A protein has these predicted regions:
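Active-site acidic/histidine proton-transfer and metal-coordination neighborhood
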Residues: 100-199
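A general structural detector for well-ordered alpha-helical segments in enzyme core domains, enriched
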Residues: 41-44, 72-80, 115, 119, ...
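N-terminal pre-domain/capping segments
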Residues: 1-93, 101-121, 307-310, 318-384
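Active-site beta-loop-alpha junctions enriched in small/polar residues
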Residues: 31-35, 58-60, 96-98, 136-138, ...
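Conserved, mostly hydrophobic/aromatic
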Residues: 45, 94, 123, 131, ...
């Protein structure tokens, strides 16, 4: 009986469902997971056809995380090379949600700073050139002092690291958040010593929620011109791409799928045709429902690539715009009702407060009048 001959192993090449479009100059991508090893973020990005991607360098809700395994770092570099990602320009990690470098409590600010610098050093270990984070909050303290503390800590961090650019993200504007208006970001950048090491990430949902109307091509261009005039075009380092579940100026950070929110598809068509936004990471952070996977990002990336070259009066574009708008109609109505109810409640509270203040002032005037009468009466008695 002849010996059994083992069939040679055939290496099967994996073909991702969504191929990367390497002909476009736009770096459309998404925030991907890195579970199981930081290198997995690279293949996850490839699988959805992303030309850029974001990831968490460690748990965004923990202060301390284990150091990277050297083998994982090596594999990260190899996969970036294999799949044609330049870590210096194509990757935009997102900082921890715990960070608040402007905290008025010194010990808490220092705790945030240690975690912040750890993130930056992880970036440099991975040869990543950009690092995005939320600027924090002044809490109950003085806002200008919080901006100064934030800038001071960024300056410290720059001196402790070598090349990674620190990218401040604009915010939706609720509470005492830093960065809900562009002036905050300008004020911080003005205080940075090495300005080559700082940049800005504009989030479409945050901008709209903070009151900047960018819902069509003209309004987007006006907003970008405002950014250029106030801060400077050279500082625009990345875009976070999200529609908004909340109306304009609602100060709510509620991301929505492209075209289904109050922004609508038009701004994303405008972005996909805005040459000045080429060659920087444009990263999706749209919600993934329980019954969905990261593949939804692959679909939205292809939508963005399809929008490139489409005009506002293109019949296919109009059909897609209306289709997505209809899909989000129910949620928009629900959030509009909540917003209107909250606005009405706040207006009532403000009116009540004004009325109370008016009553207090009237009582104070009456007391002042009584004091004057008493003083006059006493003076008259003394004179007599």
């Amino acid at each position: 009986m002849p010996p059994k001959v083992k069939a040679p192993k055939v290496k099967v090449e994996f073909t991702p469902k969504y191929e990367r479009n390497l002909t476009t100059k736009f770096k459309f991508g998404a925030h991907v997971g890195a579970s199981g090893g930081v290198y997995n973020a690279v293949t996850n990005a490839r699988d959805i056809g992303a030309n850029s991607f974001a990831l968490f360098l460690k748990s965004p809700r923990k202060w301390v995380s284990p150091e990277y395994n050297p083998d994982d770092v090596k594999k990260f570099h190899e996969l970036c090379s294999t799949h044609n990602y330049n870590p210096r320009t194509d990757i935009l990690p997102h900082g921890s949600y715990l960070l608040n470098l402007g905290n008025p409590d010194f010990e808490k600010a220092e705790k945030a700073y240690v975690s912040f610098v750890d993130d930056l050093k992880r970036c440099e270990l991975l040869n990543i050139g950009l690092y995005n984070f939320h600027p924090g909050s002044s809490l109950d303290g003085n806002h200008e002092e919080a901006l100064t503390r934030l800038a001071t800590n960024i300056n410290r961090a720059i001196k402790e690291t070598n090349f990674v650019k620190i990218v401040l993200e604009n915010m939706a504007g609720h509470g005492n958040l830093i960065g809900s208006n562009l002036q905050d970001i300008k004020d911080v950048i003005d205080m940075i010593e090495d300005k080559s090491r700082v940049g800005v990430c504009l989030d479409t949902c945050h901008s709209f929620a903070a009151g900047y109307d960018i819902s069509d091509a003209t309004k987007l261009e006006d907003f970008l011109q405002n950014f250029d005039d106030l801060i400077g075009a050279e500082y625009l380092s990345a875009i976070h791409l999200n529609d908004s579940k909340a109306p304009l100026g609602a100060n709510r950070d509620l991301h929505q799928k492209l075209g289904q929110g109050f922004l609508g598809l038009e701004v994303f068509r405008a972005i996909a045709n805005c040459k000045r936004l080429q060659n920087i990471p444009i990263v999706l952070e749209t919600p993934i429902e329980k019954n969905e996977t990261d593949e939804i990002y692959g679909e939205e990336i292809k939508l963005l690539e399809w929008l490139e070259g489409k005009s506002v009066d293109d019949a296919e574009y109009i059909e897609k715009r209306d289709q997505l708008s209809t899909a989000g109609q129910k949620e928009r109505s629900e959030h509009l009702k909540k917003y209107e109810a909250k606005t009405k409640k706040n207006a009532k509270a403000t009116a009540s407060k004004r009325k109370t203040n008016k009553t207090i002032k009237a009582e104070e005037r009456e007391n002042d009048d009584d004091d004057i009468i008493n003083k006059v009466t006493k003076k008259q008695k003394v004179t007599r």
